[in-house]
Structures are given as structure tokens and as C-alpha cells.
Amino acid sequence: MTLLELQKELFLSKINSVECATKWKVLIVDTKTADIINHFITIHSLLEEKIAAVEILENPRTPNSSFEALYILHSEEKLVDCILKDEEYDKRYPGIHIVFLDMVKEPLINKLRTSRIASKIRTVQVAYLDFTSLESRYFQVHDSFSGLRLYHPSNAAIIRQELSKVAHGIFSVCVSLGISPNIRCYYPKNAPHASKTMSFILANQLSEIVEEYCSKHPGYHEAASKSTCLIVDRSLDTAAPFLHEFTYQAMIHDLLPIKNEQYPYEILGPQGTEKRTGKLDDDDLVYTTIRHMHMRDAIEKLMKDFNQFCIDNTLFLDKERATSLNDMRSMLAGLSDFQELRDQYSLHLTMAQECMNIFEKQQLNLIGAIEQDLSTGSNVEGKVPRSVLSELLPLLDEGNAEESTKIRLLLLYIIYRDGIILQDLFRLFRHSNLSTSREQIFQNLEQLGTRVIKNLTDQSSKRKEVANSLPAGEDVYELSRYVPTLKVVLENLIQDKLDPELFPYVRNTTPQTEVSMEQTSLRSSRPSWTRSRSMASKLPREKMLVFVAGGTTFSELRTCYELSDKYNKDIYIGSTVCYSPNEWLDFFSKFQQPREALKFPEDKPRHIPCLEARPSPNRIQEQPNIDVPSTRYENTSSSDAVSIHKDEKKSKGKSHKLGKLMMSSKKDKDKSKEKVPTYGTSDKKKKKRFGVF
């Protein structure tokens, strides 16, 4: 089961576990939760789960007295205040159910317990779903500013607080996967940079959270799958962010203007040229098939599959085979009866062709070759390159070369040389015609342990204890010889060869407690720690979790997919962000900028409209307001939800009328397959009401 499927499954099971007297319920989520669920479910799917309407918690709303309310939110005091605000309206929800997506602290529960809505609260639960599944094996936690917070000097005093938030997000993934991991971390004790303890601190915070949870749920540790969680940070591999990658996913994100996983393109249709916006996600089977292939292999796969489609489809008139990307684009114009397939092929053919055009124009074959020599420390013959600088200078002197390409080459050269003297750096800057303002990028790289400037008397030190090139004789493209450090580390971990000094255990674990292939458990909608051990043997694949603090790369994502297939394991990778090389340059340029220029979300006044709205008895109920994708996402997930109920006190009350289903729009109404009847008050039975507190 993929992370997307897992999270969707758990989310729906949590919704369906909430029993309302009104049968149907209003779902109210905060904006951050809306962003999470938009990746794996559509509003139309929610309406099929007895959800009458979906609304945003922070927006002004008028409660609907015909339905009970299900609030799904993060455990923040301001968001709880939004729930309390609803009670100020004349029309009020007859019952309230609350699900927190992350661990909730006792003061917040006490605030609900002593509030005026306490008697209406039916259930309070915690569903550990505070993470965003972006791919079948990739997730993000917290927010995209996290990496910058970890390295910006203004945040030095609150680094542990930031890492704690990240640790809670990782823990949500652990509970969702039903694992109680042995935790290891990257800890280069002798490294000179101050951030060398980052992974160690994060790993220990995660360990404390796991131990606290297990102390409150004694059965969890025994029933959960035993696995390994590896915590590393960006300093593990400082070369990977700057390399030109020539696998499909990495290359299109490096060279093309992809924003929020969307790419604008044009398609030739029966009526002429049509504009489209392609969405890159796991619903696109063409994309998931080729995203980790080398671009040449990806193009061959596209052409092969397209030609096979032409042969198999008797309705397709033009039976001639495509021999080039241009042939395929022309033939796609006749696929009007297969619009979804046509759009997918057109999107990826367009991107592949544009990448190859840029490859030729920017002479990336020459640039990529020297990048591989610098990053691996060897040439294609496996020997130490002797003429790196003489090959590098013409590329830096090239007037038409991209500035970002020159900076990336210089960074890789400095990493290769383990630093250069200051005068040499200035000479290289002049060759490259770079502004001195770009010097900040090089200086900031030192925060990750990379030596940039050295004295003539300084000796070069061995930066890494791992090899970053494939053994001689391996079948690999010359421009793809570099092996991400994370891949080497994970393979050593799988083979039980990982250095315990450089990658120590936390939680007093030892190598003898490593997981075995049989120690796994099945997923279901109930908390996984309640499942019997006999169920565990049905899942043979071992789970492994790796988290890269500070941000990850597309090559590292690919690594986890490759090793999962190679070793028959479920390896999941997480971070706070995945950047393209140019985004990494922008990231490293910001470390010394004034804090006000960076616009951290926490520095802006938080504007919550619903707390400022004045209740009006004549207010018209607003339509559900949630940003959902236009296409259905193939995602599902599971998480181990944990109840935090207090003893329930029963009280009597009458059942409320059910109004007609409020659709979010006319379009939604047309798409709804199920008609919802209007219930009257003819019920003679009185429903029992109870407060969770």
C-alpha cells in the first residue's frame, strides 16, 4: 500500500468511525488540514461519505442546526477558538466531534472541557495524520520554511523547538505505518560545522515522542512492526543538490518551469492548438512509469508504449508507427476519443522534447561530464581526473552559459578540492563573470560542513567515508555515474554494514534489535497496535523510514524506489521540502538575509476571519469553501488514530431534524449519485446525548 493510499484509508476510516445522530455531518477543516487532504481525496468523494458540506474552519461560517459537526484540525489554540466561536450563533450544531491531526496537549483539552460547548462534544480523538503524502514513497512534514529556520542565524535559540515540530510529523508517519522503529542518525562528531548535531537532536526528540506514546499505549510497541528509522541531514551529501541529473523526474524539474507540480503546455487537437496545464502526480500512470528512468530510456519507453497503443487500438486510424517525438505529437492530434491518454502522452512528450532542446542548446553533455568527474572524484575510466581545471575554465568563460550553471560548477569544484584559497576563488569569479553578491551562496555552504576557503598550509581532509561512484564495469550512462551518498548509506544499513560510530543508535537500541523480514503487521482502519501477532506474518516486506532534515533531492527520492525494488522492502523517504538545483541555489543565498526579507509565516500577523466576524441571526450560510483538485487523486493512507476521551457522562435530548444536503455547488449536486431524504421528527425514540467530558 502506498503512502497516499494509506493516508486516505485512515482519513476515511476516521470520518466513518464518527457516529452522528443526524446520520449526515458537516466536515470542518483548518486550512493546513485542507492542504493535506487535497493530495489524496476530492470533495466529490467526501460527499459520498455522508458528508453534507465541507467548510474551512478559519472562514466566517454560520453553523447548520440540521447536522452535527466533525472538526478535523491541528492542535492550536486559535483553531480551538474558532470552534468556540460557532457557539455564538443563533443556529448551532446539535453535536460536535473533534479530531486532532497531531498530538494534543492537556491545556487545550482542559480548555474544551471547561468551555460552554463541553456538553455538546460527543467525541475527541487524535488521528496521527499530520504529514503530506506527495508520492507513493515520499512525504513532507511541517512546512517548506523549516530548512531555512534550521540554518538562519535569527533562529539559533529555537532550533530545538523547530526540530520538535519536525519530529512530531515524523512520528505521525510512524504511527500511520504501524511501526515502532529502532532509530539511527547521522552524527559526524568530529566535523567542524555547528549543525553537525542536527540529526542527533532530531533523532532523540523522535525517540522521546515514541517512548511517551508507548508508555500511554502499552500494547503498541509489542504489536507494531519493528523497523528502522534513519535520520540524516543535508550535510550528508552537499554535491547532490547541484548536479545536473538526467533521469526524467529530476531533469524536468531542473530545466522546465514547473510550479506546484504543474506545467503549462500546448496540444494539437482536432480544432487546432489547445492550451493545457499538466499535473504531475501518482494518478498519471505514464509519469509514474518513466519518472526514474534516464531521459533516453524514458523517450524510448514513451515511443514503444505509444506505438503499441496504435497497434492495439482498432479505432485509431493512422497505423503508421512513430519514429520520433514530432511524429508522436502529430499522431496524438487524432486521439480525441482518448482525451485523458492523449493529454498524458502530450504532456510528457512536450516536456521530454523541451528538455532535449535545452540539453543541446546549453551543451549539458560537456557540463554533465565534468560534473560527474568532480562529484565522483574519477573519470569514465575510473582514474583520478588530472585536467579538471583546464576543462572547467572554458565552461566558466562561456558568455552564453547560464549563471546558475556556472555557480553549480564552481560549488562542485570547491567540494571536490575540499576548499580553495581566497585568491583562486576571486579568479574563478572573474572567469565566470559572477557578481560578488553571489559569494553568499559559497559562504553559506560552510554551515553544512563544506570547507570553501582554505590556507595554503591547510591539508585536504577526506570529506566522506563512502564511495560516490559505481564500481568499474557497472552498466551506467557516463553522465549518471554519481551515486547519492544516501543510497550508499541505505545499502550499508540494509546489509548491516553501517558504521555505528558515524550512525549511532538512540533509545539504547543495538544492531541485534534490527528488524527481520517477518516482523511486520497488516494495515487496517483500527489502531495497528491492537492487531494480533498472527496477522503480522501476512506482510513479508520490511518497512524502513529515512528522513532528510533540511531538504532532499529528486535523486534521493529515486534512491528509495530503486532500493525498495532491489531488496524487496518498503522504504519511505521524508523531508520538509524537495528542491531542484536552482531552488537549492536560492535556498543557500538566504542564510544571511535580514529576517524581515524572508517573510517567515510566524512573523506575519495571523488573520483568522471567523474570529473577527460578528454573528448575525439573518446571516446566509456560506457555501463550502475548500480548495480541492479538479481530478481524483489515487491515494489512500492509514494512520493509527488514538482516542483521548475522558469518561463520558450521559444526558437526554431529542433528535434533531435533518435538512436537505447542502452541495458545495451546482456542479457537485449534479455529480452526486445519492439523493438524501429530508428527515422529519416523527421518530418516537429519544436519542441519548452525552458529553465527552
Curated annotation (Swiss-Prot):
GO cellular component entries: cell division site; cell tip; cytosol; nucleus; plasma membrane; prospore membrane
SUPFAM superfamilies linked to this entry: Sec1/munc18-like (SM) proteins
The family this protein is said to belong to: Belongs to the STXBP/unc-18/SEC1 family.
Region (Disordered): 514-534, 606-693
Biased composition regions of type Basic residues, renumbered to the chain: 684-693
Location(s), subcellular: Cytoplasm; Nucleus
UniProt KW keywords: Cytoplasm, Nucleus, Protein transport, Transport
Keyword Nucleus: yes
Start-end of Low complexity biased regions: 521-534
Gene3D superfamilies in UniProt: 1.25.40.60, 3.40.50.1910, 3.40.50.2060, Syntaxin Binding Protein 1, Chain A, domain 2 (3.90.830.10)
Biased composition regions of type Basic and acidic residues, renumbered to the chain: 665-676
Role description: Involved in the final stage of protein secretion.
Name under which the protein is recorded: Protein transport protein sec1
